[in-house]
Amino acid sequence: KSHVPSLRRDIGMVFQDYHLLNDRNVFHNVALPLHVIGCDASEISYRVEDALDMVGFEGKRTHYPHELSGGEKQRVTLARAVVKEPNLILADEPTGNLDPVAAFELVQLLETINNNGTTILMASHNYNLIKGRGRRIIELKDGLLRGS
């Protein structure tokens, strides 16, 4: 149990339902994990800007979640996951609430992050979105795991 906080530093989370704080703007939502681990203000500013740039989120850093589209909210959620520079990102149905174009773009972003050295573990019901991408797919069917 004492290792949980250090493990959390190495894991980023992306959820289907975003889990953004409605009373905080985009910048502060992404900065939250850095505050939790005790980063100073200058490092937070730099890393948040870098994470938002990485996910292609420009111009709405002072907007609040209710002002964003579903695709924009998911990009903010992904920026919050990568801002700590984790070794692993757990993505639980990250495309579930997105239109097909936004879902495709999000999977491309996850692939880019993976190509930069971060392991991505993504749960998805949308097999057509992930098949043929040259990635390992493990299917859970009837309680059994099947690899491809």
Which residue ranges define each predicted feature?
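Hydrophobic anchor residue at the start of the ABC signature
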Residues: 78
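Helix N-cap at the start of a conserved alpha-helix in ABC-type nucleotide-binding domains
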Residues: 100-102
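Conserved catalytic motifs of ABC-family nucleotide-binding domains
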Residues: 85
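ABC ATPase NBD coupling module
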Residues: 1-12, 41, 113-115
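Conserved ABC ATPase signature
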Residues: 64-68, 72
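Short coil-to-helix segment of the ABC ATPase nucleotide-binding domain corresponding to the Q-loop/switch region
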Residues: 24-31
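Catalytic Walker B motif of ABC-type/P-loop ATPase nucleotide-binding domains
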Residues: 89-92
